[in-house]
Amino acid sequence: MEASRGPPRVKNKAPAPQQISAEQLLREAVDRQEPALQAPTQRFADLEELHEYQGRKRKEFEDYVRRNRISMNNWMRYAQWELEQKEFRRARSVFERALDVDPTAVVLWIRYIEAEMKTRNINHARNLLDRAVTIYSRVDKLWYKYVYMEEMLGNIPGTRQVFERWMSWEPDEGAWGAYIKLEKRYNEFDRVRAIFERFTVVHPEPKNWIKWARFEEEYGTSDMVREVYGLAIETLGEDFMDEKLFIAYARYEAKLKEFERARAIYKYALDRLPRAKSVALHKAYTTFEKQFGDREGVEDVILSKRRVQYEEQIKENPKNYDIWFDFVRLEESSGDVERVRDVYERAIAQMPPSQEKRHWRRYIYLWIFYALWEELEAKDMERAHQIYQECIRLIPHKKFTFAKIWLMKAQFEIRQMDLQAARKTLGHAIGACPKDKLFKGYIDLERQLFEFVRCRKLFEKQIEWSPSNCQAWIKFAELERGLDDIDRARAIYELGISQPVLDMPELLWKSYIDFEEYEGEYDRTRALYERLLEKTNHVKVWINFARFEINIPEGEEEDEDEEEKPVSEEAKRRARMVFERAHKVFKEKEMKEERVALLNAWKSFEQTHGSPDDIAKIERQMPSKVKKRRKLDDDRYEEYLDYMFPADDESSAKLSQILQMAHKWKKEQASKASKET
């Protein structure tokens, strides 16, 4: 049974001695294919049997069309069978009956017409087509069938007559194109021109004018082509003017080496067409200038095209500073100093609509780029200085300021070898609108000049202005530390951590602790940790405290390589004491998340430095996750994950056991007292 389940397995996977090709398999399959069933051939002995068979089939077809009159397939099968029996009159009768049922069936008309054409009844077919196009003058398929039949019969005048009847209904472009192709096949070019004249009146789209011009280009003269294009431009007017027409006209003139004519056509069109409708025209003009113009002409075309584009966008929204940026970059690439200045002056004249800093952020960069361009490209230092001064005067410093512009002006003054002006600029900035970025830039400048006394004064001013800025305290202390004034750095740190409000106190404490640890003042570091733990019980502080205790070298090991020195038992003991203190605090305050993080760090410590017993002791304290439910304010319940600590369960179990024993003792005492009484 087991062997019969599933697909058969091939145990021997070696190649067969005789290989079989796909061709052999296909040939064998075809040879063995059984012949399809064929209907027996009916033979009629005399006319009576034939008439009896025909009568029976007609009765079947009549039943079909009677049951479902609107199905044209039944009618067409009936008529086709009559045609096979050479009963043309009966077939016509069937077709006519079908047309009485549904005279709008175009497929039925086509079948009827094709049947007459196949049986060479041309007049019948012509009469049918005439009926059809008279009733359904908007059905192009009938007209196409009509003109095709007349042309195949060699009746070209009749074909023209049919086309003229058709064109009187003003059909779509395909019908006109078929008429034009007919006349071209028989080299009747004057007739083609007359058809094009009528065609462009009915369908005056630019592409049809271009078709006419290309016909004249192939069979006419250059004057005729120009006449067609001129007539098209005059007929369409400025309202319906299209860039494709001008592109085709200009390319024709360029083909004839009439470059000035082509350039004039492009410029004529560009002056009259709006930007939105002349994208391809601009591109074609650029390509033309690249091919047949000089370099200046090409660059002028590109610049003028983009200038027009930017001017239109600025006209729509003059406060869009991104467009001004692109515009000035364009003019800078042209190298025309006066144009660049003009665009910059127009740009900075577009002041923001309100005195909100978010509106000024992009605008201020126009001034910055203007000043940099005057300094670096135009080499006009006096003008650059005036731009900085005007920009600073323009900013409403009582509401907001931009430290970048003050710092850039100071750097500009330094590049001009005027240090006093740079200091005056930054001093003015700090006095008018102090910012951390301004203090930082000014201090960095003085540090680069090795003016450390000035740096101290600036740090003092910054701390006086913003005593809650931890970065200022840290940088100030690092400056003193870099100058080897440890006591001064320590005093700065002490002042910093004593501030009642700090933006990021954890950074300041960490920097102070790292400073003391780097200096080897381990007692001071330990005292700092203790002071910090009085302010916060964050789990990271406890973990870092324990790690600090591990990394304290013993007296004789201080000079050894830090990677090679072993951790002493005393250091391990101190670290464990820190972990135990932290665990006790978190346990008492029921801080479960912090307690879990601490136990994980403690476990990692024991795995690195402890014994198997120590590791097992910690693992016994590791909690397990349990799902609990709590009630919400809207009387709904939600599930949450909680931690269950084995140590807590053991202590509560011991406590409950003691309570049971006390309760039992109390009962015994009560029973003894009742017996004595």
From Swiss-Prot:
HAT repeats lie at residues 52-84, 86-118, 120-152, 154-185, 187-218, 220-255, 257-291, 301-333, 335-369, 379-415, 417-448, 450-482, 484-518, 520-551, 570-608, 613-646. Keywords: mRNA processing, mRNA splicing, Nucleus, Repeat, Spliceosome. Its main location: nucleus. Gene3D superfamilies: Tetratricopeptide repeat domain (1.25.40.10). Pfam families: HAT_PRP39_C, HAT_Syf1_CNRKL1_C, HAT_Syf1_CNRKL1_N. The keyword Ion transport does not apply. One of its GO terms (cellular component) is post-mRNA release spliceosomal complex. The keyword Nucleus applies. It is found in: Nucleus. One of its GO terms (biological process) is spliceosomal complex assembly. It comes from the Eukaryota. Associated with the spliceosome. Belongs to the crooked-neck family. Involved in pre-mRNA splicing and cell cycle progression. Required for the spliceosome assembly and initiation of the DNA replication. This is Pre-mRNA-splicing factor CLF1.
